[in-house]
Structures are given as C-alpha cells and as structure tokens.
C-alpha cells in the first residue's frame, strides 16, 4: 500500500480528514500431549482500518488486503458510510502529540528459537510434571505460544506512527488425585529466553499448587480476616477495572462518578496505569488513536486522581485523552483500555501476612466473576477456594465456599499489603492484600 497515495487521494475526493490504521499479527501455538505434538499452528492476519470525516461525519472501511487497486472502492465506502451516520457526536481524527515517549521492551530471543527447541522445552516441562509426585495423574496440557504484532497509524494531519510488540509464554495444566479426591490446577509464565524458565522449578511450583488443593472442605460460615492472594486479587481488579473508564463515569454506571479528588480507598492504596512499564505486556508509546501514552495514578494514597480516557470520553468530560483509546482488533471500534494497570505493592511478605492471622482464610482462586459481581455497585459474592489459617499457620485447604463483600468498602478496611505484585495475563496486576473482614459462606 502506497500510504501517501491514499492520503492524498482522500483529500482529492473531498474527505476532510483521513486515517489509515494498519495491523499485522502473527501467532504461533504449539500444544504437547503425552510427549507428542498434538497441535502446531501458525496464523497471520493483516487488517487495515480506514476512517475518514466526510460532511462532518466519520465513515469507516475495513480491508484485509493492501492493494492500491482498492483505493477508489474504499473511499466510496467511507463516503457512503459517513452519509448514513445519524449521530450528532463530533468526529475527530487526532493531530498527533508534540513528542512520544520511548518504551523499553526486553529483547525476545524466543522468536528466533527453532521450533524443535521449543518442543523440547515443552517435553522437559511435561516430564518434570510427571516425575514430581505419584498423585499427579495427568498432565492435561503443555503449551507454548507467541504473538508478534506490528501496527502503524498514518493520517492527513501529519501523524505517522508505528511500533512492534512481541510476547512468548508457557501454559500448563495438571490433574492430581488422592483417594476419591481429584483437583486441577494451571499456571503460566511469560518468557523472553530459554533461561527465563527452569522446567524443574516451574513443574515443582505447579505440582505443589494442585496437591495443596486436595481434600479441601468448607469452613463454618462467618466473617473472617481474608487474605486475597495476588492472582485472585488481580482477577477481581480486572473484573472491576471498568469503574475507572471515563465513559462509564460520564454515563453514571461507575461508582466513582462525582468522586474525583475524594478519598475512596485506604491511604496505603495507590493504583497506577503504566504504559511505559519496561517489558510490560500492555506497554505502548501511543494508543490506537495516536495519542501519546504516559504513566498516571488513578488512585494515589487512597485519593481518586484521574480516570482513563479515549478521545470520545475526554470530549464528553471536557478534558484530554489519557492515551487509553485501544481497539480489540483492527475492525473493532476504539474503546477504553488500561495499559499495565496495577496496585502498587506494599512491604509485607506473604509469610508475615499469614503469620499475623489468628484465624483467617486465604483465597487463592475465585470463580463466577461473570455472574457473582455487580460492576456498578462493586458488590460481589464469588465461589472460592484456598486455605484455612489458625495460629498464623496454614492448617488445611478449603473449597466450596463463597466470599462476599463490597469492593469499595473492603478497600477501605485493609490490614496489610504484600510485597508480591504479580501482573496477570490481562495486563492487570496486584499484590496479595489482607482484608480486615469479609463474609465467608461455607457450612
């Protein structure tokens, strides 16, 4: 595609402003089962999103080919689409920032590693899982995945941006059985080099995780101090992250409406959106509208400081975009998305948090976030599993319990914040947090 040709042709056709969003994604997936490659797929998708303002309305056209022969067709589609728009929303194509930040991305040596070596790494992990404990009855899956994504934004207002993003990861799932009890657990890890992953240590941690779940039982219902482990806390924060979206606040479907500048959480809680995080999965110098990204506090020492905006929500609230306008794919509309959003970690070890509890519950897994959570009120009632703590020690696993409360209230009643920040696969992370009291329903 001769982009300069397209930009000039759009102007000549009477399109007031014109943008080319070009995305190319290549994905590789290797699945191992019982020592053999059970699946090996390589897929590549090239997509181009064209936007143009014609008679004050935004028209769009999507292409899967970058052939210049499609130019006349695409421009006509944009005009027709714009003429069908009845919305009175003001259309905008961004004019660009004065400068854009540098994002440091760790070099990914896995991309050039021969497939045979990636498969051998999976085989080594699978064998370590099988050899660890006789209670490991099945290695359900051992997978390697990698994603290579390139994107470029060019428009008639002088914006010419481009970047690349790479990610490689391992995922595994195992089954453990002891007597009549069977449990399943999984784990994953981003890797940039073979040296980033020790197969034996990875397998030991996953096996310990699943074996610890065996023979869990409910606890007596009541209010307990509850330690939400970092992964469970990240899942909960992910499900509620929409409360920080500017459009949700503007529409009144966020509990944070009219709370800017107010203390909403414990003063030890600070929540950051950091698109410049080195080697962060969601790191980016600019969003999908061409707006420069920057590090910002959503909550600082308990005070609600700012929300996340794309160009549309910023205009609705008479402010500027925070560089959080992203697409789910090249053919998706621009939405609001966080970029490496996390709760800053504290200074208490996981072991010390456990040791501080006379009697309490550790929650390691929560499920039912789609049904047991009200994203507006932040009330939650979630199926959970974890461990019972007595006298500062883990005494047994627990399952078939429900943890319930209100997120906003819980975040005002915190006993300790861990030093174990972990980013989730969604790009949202949290340390483990010990809450003063949450309702547990068991037996």
Residue positions per predicted region:
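Dual-mode signal for accessory low-complexity, basic/Gly-rich regions
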Residues: 259-443
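Active-site bordering "gate/hinge" segments
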Residues: 1-291, 300-303, 391-393, 429-443
């Amino acid at each position: 595609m001769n982009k300069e040709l397209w930009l000039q042709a759009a102007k000549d056709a009477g399109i007031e402003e014109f943008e080319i969003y070009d995305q190319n994604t290549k994905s590789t997936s290797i699945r191992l089962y019982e020592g053999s490659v059970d699946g090996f797929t390589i897929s590549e998708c090239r997509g181009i999103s064209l936007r143009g303002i014609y008679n004050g309305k935004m028209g769009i056209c999507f292409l899967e080919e970058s052939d210049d022969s499609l130019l006349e067709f695409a421009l006509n589609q944009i005009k027709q689409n714009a003429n069908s728009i009845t919305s009175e929303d003001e259309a905008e194509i961004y004019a660009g920032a004065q400068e854009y930040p540098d994002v440091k991305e760790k070099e990914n040596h896995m991309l050039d590693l021969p497939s045979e070596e990636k498969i051998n790494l999976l085989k080594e992990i699978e064998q370590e899982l099988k050899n660890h404990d006789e209670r490991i009855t099945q290695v359900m899956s051992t997978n390697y995945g990698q994603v290579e994504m390139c994107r470029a934004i060019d428009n008639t207002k002088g914006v010419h941006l481009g970047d690349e993003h790479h990610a490689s990861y391992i995922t595994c799932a195992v089954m453990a059985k002891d007597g009549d009890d069977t449990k399943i657990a999984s784990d994953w890890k981003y890797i940039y080099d073979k040296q980033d992953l020790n197969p034996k240590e990875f397998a030991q941690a996953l096996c310990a995780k699943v074996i610890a779940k065996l023979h869990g039982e409910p606890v007596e219902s009541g209010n307990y101090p509850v330690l939400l482990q970092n992964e469970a806390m990240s899942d909960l924060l992910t499900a509620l992250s929409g409360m920080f979206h500017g459009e949700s606040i503007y529409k009144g479907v966020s509990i944070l409406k009219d709370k800017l500048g107010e203390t909403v959480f414990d003063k030890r809680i600070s929540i950051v959106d950091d698109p410049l995080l080195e080697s962060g999965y969601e790191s980016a110098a600019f969003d999908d509208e061409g707006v420069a990204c920057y590090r910002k506090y959503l909550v600082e020492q308990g005070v609600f400081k700012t929300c996340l905006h794309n160009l549309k929500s910023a205009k609705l609230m008479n402010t500027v975009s925070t560089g959080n306008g992203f697409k789910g794919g090249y053919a998706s509309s621009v939405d609001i998305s966080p970029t490496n959003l996390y709760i800053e970690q504290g200074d208490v070890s996981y072991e010390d948090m456990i040791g501080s509890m006379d009697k309490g519950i550790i929650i390691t897994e929560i499920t039912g976030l789609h049904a047991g959570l009200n994203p507006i009120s932040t009330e939650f009632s979630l199926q959970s599993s974890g461990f019972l703590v007595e006298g500062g020690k883990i005494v047994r696993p627990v399952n078939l319990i429900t943890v319930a409360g209100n997120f906003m209230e819980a975040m005002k009643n915190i006993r300790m914040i861990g030093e174990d920040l972990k980013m989730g696969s969604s790009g949202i992370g949290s340390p483990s947090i010990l809450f003063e009291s949450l309702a547990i329903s068991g037996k």
